[in-house]
C-alpha cells in the first residue's frame, strides 16, 4: 500500500510503502526493544522523515502497536495452529518447536519482541508493557482452556492444574526465547524442547 505524505517546505510529497516501512520499524523494535529504539533509529531504517512517520503512524507508541500487530501476524501464527493439535502433548510440542523456529531464525532478529518489550522499565514504556502483558494473557487463557479440555477428554491426568501447566510451558518458552536472543544455537534449544517433552505428564 502506497502513502503520499508531504513534509512542509520540502517540495514534492514523498511516496513510500507503508507496509515496508512498518516491517523496517518492526526489525528495529525487535532488535533494540521499545525503549532502545530511538526515533532516529526508526526513521533511518524506515527511510522516512519524522513528519512522515507521525502522519502515517502517529507517535512512537502507536507505531510500536502496529509493529506488534505485524509481528503477531507474521511470527506467531504457530500459536493458534498449535492449539488445534489433537493432544495436549502435541500442543506443547508445536508451541515449543514453533518458538524455536520463530525466535532463533537466522533470517531476522533473534528472541521474542513480546518478551523484550514486557521487561521495559521506564515510565514512558508502561503502556507498552501493559499492552504486551494483556496480549500474552489472552493467549495463556486460550491455552488453559485447551488443557482443561484435554483433562475432560482423559488426555491429561485429572489432578493436573491447567493453569500451572500453562505457566510452566510459558516459562519454558520465554526462557528459550531469552536464550535465543542471547545467541543460543538451535541445537541447544532443541535439547530443551526434548527435555521438556520428556517431562510432559501423561494420562
Predicted regions and their residues:
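Amphipathic alpha-helical packing segments from all-alpha helical-bundle domains
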Residues: 76, 126-153, 164, 191-194
